[in-house]
Amino acid sequence: DLAAGDIDVVVTAPINKENVQEAGFGFTGHTEFFADRFGGEPLMVMCSERMKVGLVTIHVPLAQVSGMLSTELIVRRLEQLRRMLVTDFRVVEPRIAVLGLNPHAGDGGVIGSEEEEMMRPAVAEAVRRGILAFGPFAADGFFASGSYTKYDAVLAMYHDQGLIPFKSLSRSGVNFTASLPVVRTSPDHGVAYDIAGKGVADEGSMRDAVYAAMDIFRSRRWYGEISANPLRHYERERGADVSVKDLKLPEQQDD
């Protein structure tokens, strides 16, 4: 129904990843499932009124994170995050902070080399492409000092690096799968079997996920409408301003 356009968005409820594997689901989470079904390279982003945190890597063991990182991947994630902020959240010139992988963001290569070898070059390349990217920053001081409030989004290198401060600082949040042709959101919590049937569950995040999906769909449609037929930039070709002719009505065109 989603692919056929019969519904506009999808909001998924929490799943138990162990149980769905036993049922033959075949994916580590909803994010990977939707990427497989609809194509594209998904970007997992946690969203709240206080912050937006994107992840370079998602559901992978921590021991594998460093080996998966590369300058090219980080640049792609920055491009995805910027595109999402512009099209889905109407941020005209988003500022994006990049977190380092190692303690103290590597201390100039003393505590790991990923920052110097991959992250700084990635930030520099992103800036060259017109993205307002900054960093890499040491994650602990970045959040403890409140520096995250100066940016429209934060790019974390791995799952817990982004989600621990997000859940600690945001009372409620939404998981948004960006960079897909469809809009998919979910609450920012798990199945919570420990409180099942006790009448104490908080519906806030699920409600926020529904509202966020609606808002993102409307923003994406709005952006598509305003950018569908842009006027050509003024250019000079052989001394003639070709855009002047382009902007005339058909009956006004010179032969």
Show the residue positions of the predicted features.
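Anion-binding alpha/beta catalytic cores of soluble intermediary-metabolism enzymes, centered on
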Residues: 1-114, 120-255
